[in-house]
Amino acid sequence: MTTSAEKLAKLEQLRKERAAVIQKPTTQVSSEPVVTEKPRVRNTAYDSLAGVTIGKRASRKWSDADIKSIPIYDVHQVPAAQVIALGKDLLTQIQNNSVNTVTVDYCLVLAVSIPKPAMTSFEHLLTPPSPEQGTRLDFTQPQAGVSNRSGLTAIEKMTLNATRKNLLTETDEEKRARYEAIIKKMEDQEAGLGTSKATVVTSETEAAAYGFLAATLLKLYAKSTESYVAGLAQIRNRFAAWYDCPKAVLDAFQPTEAALVSLRAAFARRPEVLSTWTLWVAVNENRTPGLLVTQQGLLNYLACQQFAYPGMHAYTLLIEIHEHTGMKFSDLLVEMDCPATRAGVREALELIRDYEITKDHPKRTTYFRYARNWDPKYFGALQSTECKTLVYVAASVSKKVSAQGANGDPMEIFAIKNLDATIKARLDPVAENMAGKILDQMLMDEMSGASWATKASTQ
């Protein structure tokens, strides 16, 4: 029999064994990833695509040799009487909202036929592109109440010019009326105006009004109808500044927004008209001898400001920051550089270094400024929709360091209006810091007075 002592000993042994099992450490599962001894291998499967861009991101470099391949219409300038005939038909079509493809042709012919400002007689402002500039497309010159032109002989032209000069100095009303009748008859003959559809030619200044108005309408290629209507008062005032004559034609021009929408849609269907107009503009901006200051100012207003650097807001903002603050481009581009902006910043570097007219390169041409009107792939890395981060930061900095004036708020640029709040929250401090640094460089150097060292918020 088992004694009590043996039973107690056995129970004690079981207790010890159980305690040993409970106290035995359990295996812990590590939350850290298992690091193998094998070295990591770089994935090279996609290396062949490292330098590939497709679609809108493809960027093309401009060369002046490309001018010869630009498709343009074989359009011809017309004299004052025909400008008036076409101009009246143009305004009638817009007024009646009967816009069609011929209306677009009217605008082009009238724009290229615009006369020089501040002249006492009608002379075309623009020189046509040479045969080597552009690839000609067939174009039918529009006719408006005009029969076949009969023209004037050399003697008749001399008579017409002499009569115009006499009219300028004549004070006798009877003689002035006679001179005006002679001029009207000869201008009608020069333009080939028939008797059944004769167009009354009031003066050459009226021709200036139609040419000017047509050129402003071509701005609808790049601006909204709302913006055009809002700027009509300024258009009338600017015409009066360049042409010393009544602006009755412009005052009478009261287009409906519906008609302008139709015209803008008609323009969109004819991109070759824009190619033609901008090449005429670029040729005259670069011609030798150049335009007079007043003439270039007129061309700047009508076309250069609207069609230079199209869709390249980041680049024009960088130029504006440089001009307003004096910050060196080398410093400015360094500040703007990051992985998200690098393609656009590098493109800006190439534009400034290789294309722009500078102190070291005063003889360069400016055709590159209009290149994106001819092919949107030129300088594609600076297209606003392709470099929104750069546009946003440049716009924010520009707003903080320069006066906006008539150019409006750069933060209203369409490409950045709908940026998500998350990225804006990340970019705003960048712009704030950058603006402060630019202002420091703008206001402080070793010779600045002590007061300039006071820093203020750029907000």
From Swiss-Prot:
Q: Which organism is it from?
A: Lettuce necrotic yellows virus (isolate 318)
Q: Which family does it belong to?
A: Belongs to the cytorhabdovirus nucleocapsid protein family.
- GO molecular-function terms, A-Z: RNA binding
Where is this protein chiefly located?
virion
Q: Which InterPro entries match?
A: Rhabdo_ncap_2
Name listed for the protein in its UniProt record: Nucleoprotein
Compartments annotated for it: namely:
Virion; Host cytoplasm
An example GO CC term for this entry is:
viral nucleocapsid
Q: State how it assembles.
A: Homomultimerizes to form the nucleocapsid. Binds to viral genomic RNA.
